Amino acid sequence: MTKFIFVTGGVVSSLGKGIAAASIAAILESRGLKVTMLKLDPYINVDPGTMSPFQHGEVFVTEDGAETDLDLGHYERFIHAKMKKSNNFTTGQVYESVIAKERRGDYLGGTVQVIPHITDEIKHKVREGAGDVDVAIVEVGGTVGDIESLPFLEAIRQMRSNFGRKNTLYVHLSYVPYIAAAGEIKTKPTQHSVKELREIGIQPDILICRMDRELPQDEKRKIALFCNVEENAVIGCYDADSIYKVPGMLHAQGIDDIICEHLDLSLPPADLSVWNGIIDAIEHPARSVNIAMVGKYVDLTESYKSLSEALKHAGIHTRSEVNIHYIDSEEVERDGCAALKGMDAILVPGGFGKRGVEGKIKAVRYAREHNIPYLGICLGMQMALIEYARDMAGMPGANSTEFDLETDFPVVALIDEWVNHDGKIETRDENSNLGGTMRLGGQECVLESGSLAARIYGAEHIVERHRHRYEVNNHYIDRLEAAGLKISGRSAGAEKLVETIELPNHRWFFACQFHPEFTSTPRDGHPLFKAYVEAALAYQADNK
C-alpha cells in the first residue's frame, strides 16, 4: 500500500517547500524506496500555461505534455521518477471535474458541496497521481491560513482517517525569523502557524524550520513544547549556497529515520554518495565561465529556473563555475550590445510576445558576427532564423507572424497542424484559445548524420520536450539553406518541422525549437548544455 507524506507551509510563501519535499524524496529514494511526488495548487487557473512568468515563474512541461508548476522541475531533478499530468493539479481542474460530473448527473440530483464532493475529488486525484509507489510525497501549495488552501487541507486531514496513522505523515515547513535589532530568534510565527493547522484537525509530525542560521537547541525545545512535536522532529533548514546541499542537511538531522519509524518502514541506510559528488563538483570547480542570458523576464529569474539549473548541471559535469549574467533584451534593443562584451557565450531563451524581440535579434547578430558560442532555445531559435534571413539571406524585414502579420517574409508562422505526444492530430488557428493549445511534451526529432546536433547527442533519433505555437515556415527553408544555414534536425512526423539549426562556418552556433533544459538533472547533466559550456570554455581559452 502506498504511504503518503503531506508537506504544508506556513507564515510566508516562497520558503522552499518544493526543495524540502524533493530533498525528502531523494533521501527516501536513496534508501531503496520507489517514490513519486505531487503538487496541489490552490489557484483557480486550470493550469499555469497562460499565467505571466512575472507572477508564476517558469512553466515546467512534462514528457506527456502537461504545463505544470516549476516545482515539478525540482522533483525530476532530485529523484528518478518522471512527472506526468496527474502529478500536478489545481483548484480549477478539481472544480472543472466536479462540475462535469454534476452536469452528467453523477451525483443523482444531490446538492454539490465543498465537503464531500470537492474534497473527495482532491483525494481521488491524489491517489491517481500517486499510482503504485512505496511513498508519495504531496506538496500543498500556498500558505496555511489562505482561504484557497482550505479544501486541500481538509482533504489531506481526511486521508489520515482513510489510510491510518502508519500510512500518513504530516510535514510542516515554517519560517523562524531572526530579528537583528533585538539579536533574537522568534518562534511565535511558527507557533501560530501550527496552531492554525491544528484548528482544522492536522497535527504536524515533523516541523522543518526555515532560517538564515542554525536553530539553537533551546529554541528547538521551545518549538517542540508549544507545537506538540517531538524535539528530534524539529528540523532546521538553513540557507545554503546550493539547493543540492539540502538532502544532506536534512539527513544529518535524522529526518529519514523519523519518517521510517513513523511509517513503519525497515530500510537500509541512506546512500547520498551521488549527492556528495555533486556538491564536491560545485565547491571545487577548476575553471569559471561567463554566459549572457538575453531575455525579457530577467527581473524574475525563476522564469528561467530549469534553464539556469541546466547550465549549473553542465558546470558540475565540466568542473566549472558557470556565471549567468541575466541581460534585459529591451536594454540591448535600446542601448546596444555593450553588455555582451567580455562574455564567453550568449544564450537567448524561450519567451512570448513582441517586447524585447529586436534586442534578442541584436544579441544573435553579435554572437554570429563575433564568432561567440551561441545557443538559442525555442524563441531563441526563431530569433536566430529571423536574423539570418534578414542579414544573410536577402529577406529584409523578415519576421514571425507572432510579431508582424504584414511582414513580406514570414519565416516563422503559426503551426496549424501537428501530431501531439499521444499521436493525435492537433489543429489551430489565430482564433484558438491560448490555454492548452501549443505543441507540448516529448516529440521525436531526427538529426542529420554528421551534424553538430548528432555529434552533441551521440545519436540521430532523440526525444525532447516542446512548448510553442509558432514554427519555422518550411516555404523559406531552401532560400535559407542556400545562404549557408544548416537545418540539422526535423520532427519525425510527415510535417517535417524544423527542430534544430546550426551554422557550419561558425565556431559553435546551435539553436533548437525544443526545451532541452526540462530533462537536465544534476546527476546526469544534459549533452547539449555540456557541449555549450565546453564551447564557452574553449572560446575563453582562445581569447585570453
From Swiss-Prot:
Binding locations of CTP: S13, D146, I147, E148, K186, T187, K188, P189, T190, Q191, K222
Regulation of activity: Allosterically activated by GTP, when glutamine is the substrate; GTP has no effect on the reaction when ammonia is the substrate. The allosteric effector GTP functions by stabilizing the protein conformation that binds the tetrahedral intermediate(s) formed during glutamine hydrolysis. Inhibited by the product CTP, via allosteric rather than competitive inhibition.
Active site: C378 (nucleophile), H515, E517
Residue ranges constituting the Glutamine amidotransferase type-1 domain according to the UniProt record: 290-542
Gene3D superfamilies hit by this protein: 3.40.50.880, P-loop containing nucleotide triphosphate hydrolases
Keyword Magnesium: yes
Reactions accelerated catalytically: UTP + L-glutamine + ATP + H2O = CTP + L-glutamate + ADP + phosphate + 2 H(+); L-glutamine + H2O = L-glutamate + NH4(+); UTP + NH4(+) + ATP = CTP + ADP + phosphate + 2 H(+)
Cytoplasm in keyword set: no
Top EC class of this enzyme: ligase
Entry EC number(s): 6.3.4.2
Pathway membership, UniProt: Pyrimidine metabolism; CTP biosynthesis via de novo pathway; CTP from UDP: step 2/2
Keywords: ATP-binding, Glutamine amidotransferase, Ligase, Magnesium, Metal-binding, Nucleotide-binding, Pyrimidine biosynthesis
Classification via CDD domains: CTPS_N, GATase1_CTP_Synthase
Family annotation (InterPro entries): Class_I_gatase-like, CTP_synthase, CTP_synthase_N, GATASE, GATase1_CTP_Synthase, P-loop_NTPase
Region (Amidoligase domain): 1-265
GO molecular function, one term: metal ion binding
Assembly, per entry: Homotetramer.
PANTHER family in UniProt: CTP SYNTHASE (PTHR11550), CTP SYNTHASE-RELATED (PTHR11550:SF0)
Family: Belongs to the CTP synthase family.
Additional facts recorded: CTPSs have evolved a hybrid strategy for distinguishing between UTP and CTP. The overlapping regions of the product feedback inhibitory and substrate sites recognize a common feature in both compounds, the triphosphate moiety. To differentiate isosteric substrate and product pyrimidine rings, an additional pocket far from the expected kinase/ligase catalytic site, specifically recognizes the cytosine and ribose portions of the product inhibitor.
Protein name, per record: CTP synthase
Protein source organism: Laribacter hongkongensis (strain HLHK9)
Originating gene: pyrG
